[in-house]
Amino acid sequence: MSVQTTKRRLSPASIEALKGERPIVSLTAYTTPIARLLDPHVDFLLVGDSLGMVLYGLDTTVGVTLDMMIAHGQAVMRGSERSCIVIDLPFGSYQESKEQAFRSAARILKETGCSAVKLEGGAEMAETVDFLVSRGIPVLGHVGLMPQLVNTTGGYRSVGRNEKEVAKIRRDAKAIDDAGAFAIVVEGTVEPVAREITATLRCPTIGIGASPACDGQILVSDDMLGIFNDFKPRFVKHFAELAPAISKAVEDYANEVKARTFPGIEHTFQVKR
């Protein structure tokens, strides 16, 4: 009699336990094929609302809907088996009230099978984080630069450059930590401030444009693979340059189709005689 075993996914609790043990590795994923490629190498995959800009060509993440996040979350779940899957709560799906946040987050977990949700916000969202966590929904926090607030902050710029901003980041990070987040993304924050809050928080920090001292790092996959070239943030490193390779492959395909050299006989079905 054989016993079938399935790989056990990393959980939010296991991500939290990595603080002080080793750096946490994370990337974004939006589709099944990419999730399959990333899954063996990362601790958690974030189905980020950045998909609005990367996949849908939106100028900001504000236009992303809950239905979009759920559809892509389902795709990433199908393409992964070991990494913890976290899905962004999109703009407008949680800010109105903690009850609205619970309804949105519960729907995401029930319809995708993911392990946790992420939300942006500082001290003003601490009550919501506590409300979700106390009702069985793990939360990944997000402080510093908050892309969903781009319309009120005036653009994508690093934060922590004056005492007022530093005080806010400290206050926000502590509030979300105290509310029970299993980890906190720290985005676009000057290095000394990101380093400081990493040393003081209970939960791990996940840096993106923050500090190498953060407990982990995350990047948008299409950025680090050199696919999304609309703009390149200072904090992005291209670990590959796939855009030129893709362009060249499509050019070669087009040329072969026009020259009738593709498909070759080996790419066709023949009748056996």
Swiss-Prot record:
Binds 1 Mg(2+) ion per subunit. Its EC number is 2.1.2.11. One of its GO terms (biological process) is pantothenate biosynthetic process. Its cofactor is Mg(2+). Pathway: Cofactor biosynthesis; (R)-pantothenate biosynthesis; (R)-pantoate from 3-methyl-2-oxobutanoate: step 1/2. The keyword rRNA processing does not apply. Pfam families: Pantoate_transf. Catalyzes the reversible reaction in which hydroxymethyl group from 5,10-methylenetetrahydrofolate is transferred onto alpha-ketoisovalerate to form ketopantoate. This is 3-methyl-2-oxobutanoate hydroxymethyltransferase. It comes from Sinorhizobium fredii (strain NBRC 101917 / NGR234). The gene is panB.
